[in-house]
Curated annotation (Swiss-Prot):
Pfam families: SAM_Ribosomal_mS41 (PF09597). The lineage of its organism: Eukaryota, Fungi, Dikarya, Ascomycota, Pezizomycotina. It comes from Neurospora crassa (strain ATCC 24698 / 74-OR23-1A / CBS 708.71 / DSM 1257 / FGSC 987). SMART domains: IGR. Keywords: Mitochondrion. One of its GO terms (cellular component) is mitochondrion. This is Small ribosomal subunit protein mS41.
Amino acid sequence: MKSSLRIQSTLGLLFRPCAVSAPATAPGLNAHARWAHKTAAQLPLIPKPTPFVPDVPTFLTLIGRDLKQHADKFPTWEALFTLTTDQLRELGVEPPRARRYLLRWRQRFREGKFGIGGDLKHVENGVAYLKIHEKEASPTRTSRRVVNVPANQHVEEVSEGERVKVKGYKVKGVSTIVGPYALPVQKGVAKLAVTEGMWEDKRGHKVDGGERRRAEVRFKRGVAERKALREKMGFY
């Protein structure tokens, strides 16, 4: 009788269902996932146009890569920021790297990561004026910075809150504004106009045909150069 009870007890232990433990997750990974989800939720799906980028054609002109040819495929600003990569392909945005490039710049714009001029506030017909704001830093020194103000107003006439400090530009000497795409207008004044490819990420170029063909291309070039040298020396 006792041996029978021992056998039943042993069988019970063998066939007892095991509790499935939840996979352990590092606390840091959970925190990172929550932060990423929160950040993504906070970003607007459709960002607002800016004074320097008021519409689809301007956006596509700025980011370059000849994407402005596709401007008529986006009937609205909302369409530009909501179409999926499959929809872009159906509309004829080719090649695939052009779609990837457009999607990258869409995300940057959502995050407020603009190119040159993206932070400008006073823009008219795609042109912004940059002027020099002088301020006495000490009895012996005057600080000068480049600001964006309305074209028909002097810097002193514009309130402090309306003077937009422009990133990427500085004052050289006393009255010269220097920076990308800055066109001098007169002493202490420059203008910045929307230009094709202002924000473009420049692509690298393959040297000697790329990684796989490089050795072959360089070998053939060496053969041709040696042959030309022998011909020049009269060996042929």
